[in-house]
């Protein structure tokens, strides 16, 4: 969303209530609210990115990243219908992620896969116990947990970056419904894009509709204002007609159908690099 504001305003925003940037989980994503720490970091980064965009150096803020990735398949049984994903399906999912993140300079390298049959964990009950048992790597490594189902119709959720403490590292990663993988059982959302969306949160991106038409939105300057989440692929939607640009329905951080997703913006690319450098690199 456009954030043509001065530094002093952004720093004031960073100190304001987190509730103004609460993440909408109604449709498909259960990501938690961004913390005050993250909002403050986003505001500071937004200033630097706006200055870089103005002088033509925004692309230089984007870094090439290779992310070690661990996949945990947690299902109610060993049947494919229960979400017990095959190696081939996992490779397809990683291929989608690598294709979609390639313009951002980000690639994911599969370092390990494990499979667990646990009826409670597979329905997203006992998250802390599950992640304590299964999580691998450090805070800079991505852990993906594919579950048979997530309550409330949620397709996935992921934790934003934060200062690396024992608890934040333990819970870190993305939890995703197995039916969203390529060829999965959830129609409209079975091209593997839910993982792309959720990993965007892992890199510190908010939803494009954050804050609606009049708030400060996702604190990324080149994502147009958006009143609410998209559904389907509503070409030409303009939910904030008094703000520049049409709704970013093709952006991975909206709620469009998988077939509608196409891009991250240059500002989002720079933000992901900045967030990784501040919160995850070397952790």
Curated annotation (Swiss-Prot):
This is Extracellular metalloprotease MGG_08041. The active site is at 198. Keywords: Disulfide bond, Glycoprotein, Hydrolase, Metal-binding, Metalloprotease, Protease, Secreted, Signal, Zinc. CDD domains: ZnMc_pappalysin_like (cd04275). It is found in: Secreted. GO terms for cellular component: extracellular region. The keyword NAD does not apply. GO terms for biological process: proteolysis.
């Amino acid at each position: 969303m456009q954030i043509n504001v001065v530094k002093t305003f952004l720093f004031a925003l960073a100190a304001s209530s987190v509730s103004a940037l609460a993440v909408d989980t109604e449709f498909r994503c259960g990501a938690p609210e961004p913390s005050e720490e993250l909002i403050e970091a986003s505001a500071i980064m937004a200033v630097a990115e706006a200055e870089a965009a103005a002088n033509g150096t925004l692309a230089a803020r984007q870094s090439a990243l290779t992310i070690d990735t661990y996949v945990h398949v947690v299902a109610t049984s060993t049947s494919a219908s229960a979400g017990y994903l095959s190696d081939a399906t996992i490779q397809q999912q990683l291929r989608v992620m690598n294709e979609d993140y390639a313009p951002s300079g980000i690639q994911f390298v599969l370092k390990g896969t494990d499979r667990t049959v646990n009826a409670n964990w597979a329905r997203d009950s006992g998250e802390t116990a599950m992640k304590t048992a299964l999580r691998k790597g450090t805070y800079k490594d991505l852990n993906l947990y594919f579950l048979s189902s997530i309550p409330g119709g949620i397709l996935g959720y992921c934790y934003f970056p934060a200062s690396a403490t024992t608890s934040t590292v333990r819970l870190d990663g993305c939890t995703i419904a197995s039916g969203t993988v390529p060829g999965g059982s959830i129609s409209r959302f079975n091209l593997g894009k839910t993982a792309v969306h959720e990993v965007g949160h892992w890199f510190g991106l908010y939803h494009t509709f954050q804050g609606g038409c009049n708030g400060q939105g996702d604190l990324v300057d080149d994502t147009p204002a958006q009143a609410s989440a998209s559904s389907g692929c509503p070409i030409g939607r303009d939910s904030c007609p008094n703000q520049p640009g049409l709704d970013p329905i093709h952006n991975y951080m909206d709620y469009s159908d998988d077939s509608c997703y196409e891009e991250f913006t240059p500002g989002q690319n720079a933000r992901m690099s900045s967030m990784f450098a501040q919160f995850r690199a070397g952790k």
